């Protein structure tokens, strides 16, 4: 995604290496929180508004389109990746193919949670 490309470029510039998946998840987390705070105009006492905004997940994810399933797990794509060396000799991964598109957790259908 374009957001992912910018994230990787900025991360490499600052840290001199490719970001880990944990770094991407952390970035998404803070972007989700930021989108919720903006949705309530900074009024953190508006807990219902914060919850609604967090559920909506209207933020630019580095993983592409992002939404939650009924069990509060992300619905997202999964990829088969191959470790390769880039033009500078650094190890990175390339996407070989999309394994699952908009995949929801296998047990979501059994989950009794609801919004």
What are these model-predicted stretches?
Residues 1-115:
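Extracytosolic ligand-binding ectodomains
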């Amino acid at each position: 995604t374009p957001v992912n490309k910018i994230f990787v470029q900025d991360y490499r510039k600052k840290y001199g290496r490719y970001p880990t998946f944990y770094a991407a998840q952390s970035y998404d987390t803070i972007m989700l929180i930021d989108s919720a705070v903006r949705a309530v105009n900074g009024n953190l006492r508006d807990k219902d508004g914060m919850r609604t905004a967090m559920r909506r997940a209207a933020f630019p994810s580095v993983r592409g389109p992002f939404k939650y399933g009924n069990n509060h797990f992300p619905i997202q794509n999964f990829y088969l990746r191959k470790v390769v060396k880039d033009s500078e000799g650094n190890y990175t991964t390339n996407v070989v193919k999309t394994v699952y598109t908009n995949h929801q957790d296998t047990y979501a259908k059994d989950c009794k949670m609801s919004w």
